[in-house]
């Protein structure tokens, strides 16, 4: 059963069960690598490191996703249609969160998500 994204004043929380956020970030990073190798004209990866991913899609949208191992959060900046949007830091507290957070990031990566106002920092 999927979890839900709960918006707080300063952060987002994925309401599910606990698995490490680092694993979620690593899966997302590998997903970007896979997309780069298989959709050659669709994505331009600018940086792909253990704690940061920066890439641009052919429609001009670009994304910077960082993982902070000290605070254990993912922070995402999205540049959509010449607009700079910073998504609130993502904190994950309880158990099945790996799949949910990965799905959230996957939706963002594939332009399938409607970014809600309460998610914006």
Language model region names:
Residues 42-78:
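Amphipathic, interaction-prone secondary-structure segments
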Residues 3-6, 36, 53-56, 62-64, ...:
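Intrinsically disordered, low-complexity Ser/Thr/Pro-rich tracts
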Residues 20, 68-70, 79-80, 105:
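Surface-exposed beta-strand edges and their flanking turn/coil or helix-capping segments
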Residues 7, 14-15, 22-43, 83-121:
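Mixed-charge, Lys/Arg-enriched low-complexity segments
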């Amino acid at each position: 059963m999927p979890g839900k994204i709960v918006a707080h004043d300063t952060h987002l929380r994925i309401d599910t069960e606990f698995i490490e956020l680092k694993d979620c970030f690593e899966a997302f990073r590998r997903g970007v690598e896979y997309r780069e190798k298989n959709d050659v004209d669709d994505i331009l990866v600018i940086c792909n490191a253990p704690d940061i991913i920066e890439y641009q899609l052919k429609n001009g949208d670009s994304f910077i996703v960082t993982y902070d191992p000290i605070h254990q959060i993912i922070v995402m900046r999205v540049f959509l249609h010449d607009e700079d949007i910073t998504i609130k830091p993502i904190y994950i507290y309880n158990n099945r969160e790996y799949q949910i957070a990965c799905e959230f990031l996957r939706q963002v990566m594939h332009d399938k998500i409607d970014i809600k106002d309460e998610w914006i920092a």
